[in-house]
Amino acid sequence: MYIDTASDIIEQTVSGFNTTIFAYGQTSSGKTHTMYGTASETGVIGMAVEQLFHAVEETPDRRFLMNVSYMEIYNEMVNDLLCDSKSRPAGGLKVRENEEGFYVEDLIQKTVTSAEEIHRYLLCTIRLYS
């Protein structure tokens, strides 16, 4: 499934495009399992992160700035998953539009330089939402 869906998105990212990997479905339909995977089977996020950093290493003639955000839309509310649940706004975050396109106001973005950093952020969210 990863090769058919997310692999091309990572190639576009390395080419300079802003990209998003988005999981959609009913509650308990397997979105979290598909995205995170298990201890023995890497999920979409893990494979994408590894592919991204491998591609960066293979492109030494370019400089990359990588930011990571992680959010969910649940019951029509946008929640920042990199934010402690206690400090989230009660009504969720707002989706806005400007001349550059759509964005989520106040969504945390973390600058990252390694796959390990992203995995640490994800581990924090797994602990908060498990």
Q: Predicted regions: what is each one?
A:
Residues 1-130:
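Microtubule-binding structural modules
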